[in-house]
Amino acid sequence: PTGREEAWRFTPLKRLGGMHDGTAIVADRHSLSLGGSSISGVTFELKSASEAPVLSESDDAIVGRIREYASEVAVLTIAANTEVAEPILLKRSAADLSSAEFSRVQIKIESQAQATIIIENTGDTHLAEDLEINVAPGANLTLVSLQEWDANTVHAGRQHAVVDRDATFKSIVVTIGGSLVRLLPTVEFSAPGASCELLGVYFATSGQFFEHRMFVDHKVPNAKSRVNYKGALAGDQAHTVWIGDVFIRAAADGTDTYELNRNLLLSDGARADSVPNLEIE
């Protein structure tokens, strides 16, 4: 990308550390781990890329780099009919700004299972992340993503969920740390009766850049989506971007969708860009 493309027009490319154009030094590290003790019906393992093929397509430049560089995939699986009472904690902590980690992660919740997963991101690092989520028929998943990075972190991530028949997916994104955070929480419905809720809060202070770029693909009938993001900004050159894009395809009769973004500017010199989009095929 050059910055002239619609998907990149707000992003300060020079601050991405080369993760978008192939000039980053690729780190050989896996900073994601499962916190706490083992849980019945839940497995977390590192697989080779050939053992964990991609679950979705993406035209994002950084996702393309991740899939080129990442030789292993962290896979979390929740077995069918498992109801996990306590939240599952995934922790990512790193302290290396000299190279970039290109990370592939897959979360698979099987049919009729129910769970809450918390991803806690801390430390100072450069991270490119492709997180794919598969929500099987009748499953119910809540995913909480906490960006609590230190001041110099650059984090570019995609969080893409495929939601099947009568399944429910809730995403809660909290972004308060890092120098630059660019997240793509996206959803595609693969069968009728699916629903999603994308919620987010962010607080940017002096010099921080936070971009949250939503896309919900209503490709089947009778699916429901709710998007609600709220932000606050304080300090010179604090900058946030929210893009909310809902695509209703011709076959998606009975679609129920809603999106909202609100921002509170607490000082001069801060800027919040908000762009809602609704596309009907």
Located regions from the model:
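Long, low-complexity, mixed-charge
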Residues: 1-57, 61-67
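Conserved beta-strand/loop scaffold segments within soluble protein domains that form the structured core
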Residues: 51-281
